């Protein structure tokens, strides 16, 4: 008999520190989430040092700027940051707008017209020399590069 627990969709469970600490099959670990943002977007793991990560449902990862007992049955805990139980992990719009300014790779700067098209959710063909997959779209506002969302480059 397996000692693995099952996912309970009505509660938040803190992510295990590492894959070796996992007690629910398929659940991401804190290390894997932090590594994803570091490897995909070049975000320094130290950015996430004071945050806890939680799963509610299957693969909906939340980030919380504090700690709480685990499990906990509440409607929301921080903000959603990542979807993991699919082939390619997808960061949320909120995560990109909050943490995207720390990214050093897979960031595409959009001019005014392209940024407006992006904001409307329309597909567009843009030249990109980097990797395919999810990119952080940015636009310069007031002289500063601001993340406006996440887009899929194929």
Language model regions located:
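Polybasic, low-complexity RNA-engagement segments
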Residues: 2-154
